[in-house]
Amino acid sequence: MAKGQSLQDPFLNALRRERVPVSIYLVNGIKLQGQVESFDQFVILLKNTVSQMVYKHAISTVVPSRPVSHHSNTPSGSTNNYHGSNPSAPQQPQQDSDDAE
């Protein structure tokens, strides 16, 4: 399970840290909008006019309103991406390589 979260944790943490507005689409088609306030292994706390606890198993898609840099510079298996932890070092922007043709 740690392997699956190695993508979602840095992504959600970047959304939370940068306060990026997001649209979250649920599997039943409902669209929720707000900012990621916090998250854990099972839920995302989405804040708009109220805070909503959204279970991850009900989420189909998370769409940020703008691009975010979510590459993790931490070794795999690290659990430093959960809400409440402080990054140990400032994140440096990285560029995706588009060498594939």
Swiss-Prot record:
Belongs to the Hfq family. Residues 9-68 form the Sm domain. Keywords: RNA-binding, Stress response. GO terms for biological process: regulation of DNA-templated transcription; regulation of RNA stability; regulation of translation, ncRNA-mediated. GO terms for molecular function: RNA binding. The keyword RNA-binding applies. Residues 70-86 have a biased composition (Polar residues). The keyword Lyase does not apply. Homohexamer. Transmembrane segments: none annotated. InterPro entries: Hfq, LSM_dom_sf, Sm. Residues 63-101 are annotated as: Disordered. One of its GO terms (cellular component) is cytosol. It comes from Yersinia pestis. This is RNA-binding protein Hfq. RNA chaperone that binds small regulatory RNA (sRNAs) and mRNAs to facilitate mRNA translational regulation in response to envelope stress, environmental stress and changes in metabolite concentrations. Also binds with high specificity to tRNAs.
